[in-house]
Amino acid sequence: SSGAPKRTSEGKDGFGATTGMGICHSYTPDGRCVSLLKILLTNFCVYDCQYCVNRRTSNVPRARFSVDEVVKLTTDFYFRNYIDGLFLSSGIIQSADYTMEQLVAIARELREVHNFRGYIHLKTIPDADPALIAAAGRYADRLSVNIELPTEAAVERLAPEKKVHTIKLAMGSIRRKLDEKAEEPRSPKFAPAGQSTQMIGGADASDDQTILSTAETLYGSYKPKRV
């Protein structure tokens, strides 16, 4: 990737910004930079994680896209060469299964109805039915499950409605599916770009050593492409 600083036209007249609201840049294993429409299906959420701006008790404006709206945004931007793909996440609405069903429906419609061949990254909801996670992998290039924080104690304190055990079960399920695909190349497609995860630094007192140790454990246990 280029060592040049990222340009922004925020607050200025002009064009050519390399950063901007809604479009992020990611790098493929071969070094290519790809532009992704990075959006939430909704910022409504039933969870009240203390570190999240969209937590249940946060006084922020709320919005929600429909499945058709996300599909249209993605295809319109793609055909105009604004993006190379979609990075889709969501707050939790109604239930984990309901929300995951909506994410899968978007990916399914893009692939099967619109023959979309761009990149799709879906955030996976750990509490969702494993069958929904498996379905997500059939349509997405990459899946990701957030580990949230560097330690289980921090998750229990700052996001008590989430369970590290459940998060790790979801990551383990994805790893097994990826291993099965590697052993049987002719089996149905499953997240060919693998899985990734992320955690928030600075929300608790974890030092660099703790963060690096957690990342090392995750790489060893679940083989994510990126932490």
Language-model segments: residues:
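Conserved, mostly hydrophobic/aromatic
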Residues: 36, 49, 88, 145, ...
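Canonical Radical SAM [4Fe-4S] cluster-binding loop centered on the CxxxCxxC motif
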Residues: 39-68
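Residues forming anionic-ligand binding surfaces in small-molecule and nucleic-acid pockets
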Residues: 47-51, 82-83, 148
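Hydrophobic residues within beta-strands of alpha/beta enzymes
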Residues: 52, 85-88, 143-145, 227
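Short acidic, glycine/Ser/Thr-rich loop/turn "cap" segments at secondary-structure junctions
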Residues: 54-60, 86-96, 120, 155
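Conserved AdoMet/S-adenosylmethionine-binding subsite of the radical SAM
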Residues: 71, 94-227
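Short Fe-S-cluster ligation motifs
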Residues: 73-89
